[in-house]
A protein has these predicted regions:
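A gly/proline- and charged-residue-enriched helix-loop-helix capping module
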Residues: 63-93
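C-terminal end-helix/capping segment
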Residues: 58-70, 295-305
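An N-terminal domain-cap segment
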Residues: 9-33, 39
Length: 305
């Protein structure tokens, strides 16, 4: 994959041949070379989605330890997000705050947005190259994520929703398998998780170094001044549902947070949706987000290891 800002996902249409010809070995090649592939004009029907996903995602994963609000709609198929339509979701790699992240994502458009609603995608190498040397140096030792998950009543997601489990022992087994993770059960029944993760990673096949963290999404500065101030009146930063610092616990300069967010969005290419479209993404090479929209929009997502 190129590190320049001219990157764009590959696009496959019926003129390139039958859909099934592109969903196995050819797709593997395209994802390594281009990072993301859009399939347009094939008219994939909701009734045929499972068959397509079985080819694209060889081992579909449940959305365990995910922080985005989503709903199940099928066998390890979810709504892409349920954040309010008027909000922009900044660029990120799925579960990059975790020691376990999906290798591949598949987004499917069931209902065309009324207006807006594109899924922006960005090369992680281009995003890294767009950041200032000072910022990259500051993040060299990684970041520390803190998650506060309530027990069913509170702000944000519960630990039961996050881990799709009701058994504490099952959650602990999951966390124990993730290096760099500590946790504690709180007196109110909630769960606090701390994880130290790198800010960049190297793709295991291509060797490409990419920006790979969610520091900007987990930092209060990304919420805007009014929202951040309102939350500060309710609870200290370390008790927010999501909080991030540098790996040593020192605070991250809000200016860095805004630089990460803004340069990622500026380098992104919008994938505009039509019903029946499919977008497949290498979750290390390429980050994704969501533009605001009005009217109907239904985009589904599934993941694989």
């Amino acid at each position: 994959m190129t590190e320049t800002m001219t990157w764009a996902p590959a696009e496959i249409t019926p003129s390139d041949g039958p859909l099934l010809d592109h969903l196995t070995e050819r797709l593997d090649e395209l994802l390594l070379s281009d990072g993301a592939v859009v399939f347009r004009g094939f008219g994939i029907a909701p009734s045929g989605l499972d068959g397509v996903l079985d080819r694209v995602l060889r081992n579909r994963l449940a959305y365990v330890h995910g922080n985005s609000p989503r709903s199940h709609v099928g066998d390890r198929v979810y709504t892409s997000t349920e954040y309010p339509a008027e909000q922009t979701i900044s660029m990120h790699n799925e579960l990059s705050y975790s020691a376990r992240w999906p290798a591949r994502l598949a987004f499917y458009c069931e209902t065309t947005p009324g207006s807006g609603g594109a899924t922006p995608v960005v090369s992680g190498a281009a995003w890294l190259a767009a950041l200032s040397p000072r910022l990259r140096a500051a993040f060299a030792d990684g970041v520390r994520y803190t998650q506060n998950l309530h027990d069913g009543h509170g702000f944000g997601k519960s630990w039961q929703e996050t881990f799709e489990a009701s058994d504490r022992a099952e959650v602990e087994r999951h966390l124990a398998a993730m290096p760099g993770t500590t946790w504690e059960w709180k007196r109110d029944g909630g769960l606090r998780i701390a994880q130290v993760r790198p800010a960049t990673v190297t793709h295991p096949v291509t060797g490409t170094r990419v920006w790979f963290n969610q520091a900007d999404q987990w930092h209060h500065a990304a919420l805007g001044d009014e929202t951040a101030a309102a939350l500060a009146r309710i609870m200290p930063e370390e008790d927010l549902p999501q909080h991030v610092t540098f790996a040593d616990g020192s605070p991250i300069d809000p200016a860095y947070v805004l630089e990460i967010r803004d340069r990622g969005l500026a380098a992104a290419v919008d994938v505009d949706w039509r019903a029946g479209d499919l977008l497949v993404v290498d979750n290390v090479l390429v980050a994704h987000g969501r533009r605001p929209y009005a009217g109907p929009r239904r985009v589904l997502v599934a993941m694989s290891g």
